[in-house]
Amino acid sequence: MAVPSELKYSKEHEWVKVEGNTVTIGITEYAQGELGDIVFVELPEVDDEINEGDTFGSVESVKTVSELYAPVSGKVVESNEELEDSPEFVNESPYEKAWMVKVELSDESQLDDLLSADQYKEMIGE
């Protein structure tokens, strides 16, 4: 199972790619595998504020609906609109095509609370 080493991870199975003061957020390969085939993705609008630990959207699979939890706080600067028409990207390409949102960080110190790839692998039993 892919757990890219350059990313950070939340305990709620979101991944975070840090690029300066902006982060890209998605869900992990492990999470999409647990959910099954994704049929719908609901994401916030550009300029929405998200807060660490709060829900910022959801993914619906054939099995269940799962909330997305913000691993950091900040302002949404981009939302992946392709997922509206192609939610299957979450299953096919969780780390590339299926990023969820890009967020301008309001508190960079929150990144310190995230897990490294090794810590995340340990958490999921890899």
Curated annotation (Swiss-Prot):
One of its GO terms (biological process) is glycine decarboxylation via glycine cleavage system. Keywords: Lipoyl. Binds 1 lipoyl cofactor covalently. The keyword Cell membrane does not apply. Its cofactor is (R)-lipoate. The keyword Cytoplasm does not apply. Residues 22-104 form the Lipoyl-binding domain. InterPro entries: 2-oxoA_DH_lipoyl-BS, Biotin_lipoyl, GCV_H, GCV_H/Fam206, GCV_H_sub, Single_hybrid_motif. The modification N6-lipoyllysine is found at K63. It comes from the Bacteria. GO terms for cellular component: cytosol; glycine cleavage complex. Belongs to the GcvH family. The glycine cleavage system catalyzes the degradation of glycine. The H protein shuttles the methylamine group of glycine from the P protein to the T protein. Is also involved in protein lipoylation via its role as an octanoyl/lipoyl carrier protein intermediate. The glycine cleavage system is composed of four proteins: P, T, L and H. This is Glycine cleavage system H protein. The gene is gcvH.
